C-alpha cells in the first residue's frame, strides 16, 4: 500500500493539472498550460526549447511524475503533457554509479537518440524504425554494446545478454532510447528506454515507462532537440 499511494497521488495530480484532450489519429491536440515555475529554473531549460522531465518520488521509489514542456517565442514554458510513470525496480542512481543489471534508472541530462517500436511509425519527428524479429538491443560487451543490431549482421551476439525487442510486445510498441552510455562502455548499462507500461509490474528494469496513450502523444510531439532531465522530485526543486 505504501508503494501504491504515491502513484495514486500522482494520478490525481496529473489529471487535475491537465485538461482533457480529444482523441485524434494525427498529431495530438495539446491543450498547453503554464509549466510549474521550477521548470524554467532547471539548468537545462536555459538553452532548451523542449524538455522531458522525469521527477522520481525518491531515490529508492519506483514511481515518478513525468511531464513534457515547450518554450514559447516569448521565453515562457508551457506544459504539454503530464502523467504518472515508473522507473527502475531499485529506484534511481547517479549516472556514474549505474551498472548493467542494477535495475536503476540513471540520473542525468540526456537526449532521445533513437525512435523505434513494434508498431508502425506514429508520425515521429525523430527517424523511426519499425522493428521485426531480427532486431535486438545488444547487451553483449564484445559486440556493439548498447546498440540496436540486426541478428543477421551479428550472428554470434550473446543473446542471453541482449534484448529481443519483439518479445516485449506491451512495453516496446513505441520506444525512445534515452542517450545514456552513448559511448557503449561495456558494463555501464544498456537499453535505457522511454517506453509503454508493461503488464502487471509497477516498475521497470531501469527504463522510464508511461501509459501507452501518453507514449503515443510523446512520439508525435518529441523533437530531435528535446532535452531529457531525470532526477528526484526534491532535487529538481519541484513543487506543486
Regions found by a protein language model. Name each.
Residues 207:
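Short cysteine clusters
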Residues 210:
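A conserved hydrophobic position in a structured secondary element of the catalytic/binding core
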Residues 1-7:
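Sec-dependent signal peptide recognition
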Residues 7-17:
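Hydrophobic h-region of N-terminal signal peptides that target proteins for export
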Residues 21-204, 213-226, 230-240:
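Cell wall/extracellular polymer interaction/catalysis modules
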Amino acid at each position: 500500500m505504501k508503494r501504491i499511494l504515491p502513484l495514486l497521488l500522482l494520478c490525481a495530480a496529473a489529471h487535475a493539472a491537465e485538461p482533457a484532450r480529444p482523441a485524434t489519429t494525427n498529431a495530438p491536440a495539446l491543450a498547453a498550460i503554464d509549466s510549474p515555475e521550477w521548470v524554467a529554473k532547471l539548468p537545462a531549460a536555459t538553452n532548451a526549447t523542449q524538455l522531458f522531465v522525469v521527477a522520481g518520488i525518491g531515490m529508492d521509489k519506483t514511481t515518478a511524475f513525468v511531464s513534457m514542456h515547450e518554450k514559447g517565442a516569448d521565453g515562457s514554458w508551457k506544459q504539454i503533457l503530464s502523467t504518472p510513470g515508473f522507473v527502475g525496480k531499485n529506484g534511481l542512481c547517479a549516472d556514474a554509479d549505474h551498472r548493467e543489471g542494477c535495475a536503476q534508472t540513471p540520473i542525468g541530462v540526456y537526449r532521445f537518440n533513437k525512435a523505434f517500436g513494434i508498431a508502425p511509425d506514429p508520425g515521429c519527428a525523430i527517424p523511426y524504425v519499425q522493428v521485426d524479429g531480427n532486431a535486438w538491443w545488444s547487451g553483449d560487451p564484445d559486440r556493439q554494446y548498447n546498440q540496436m543490431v540486426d541478428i543477421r549482421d551479428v550472428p554470434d551476439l550473446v543473446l542471453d545478454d541482449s534484448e529481443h525487442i519483439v518479445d516485449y510486445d506491451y512495453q516496446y510498441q513505441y520506444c525512445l532510447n534515452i542517450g545514456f552510455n552513448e559511448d557503449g562502455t561495456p558494463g555501464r548499462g544498456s537499453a535505457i528506454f522511454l517506453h509503454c507500461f508493461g503488464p502487471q509490474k509497477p516498475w521497470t528494469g531501469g527504463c522510464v515507462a508511461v501509459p501507452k496513450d501518453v507514449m503515443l502523444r510523446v512520439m508525435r510531439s518529441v523533437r530531435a532537440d528535446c532535452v531529457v532531465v531525470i532526477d528526484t522530485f526534491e532535487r529538481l526543486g519541484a513543487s506543486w
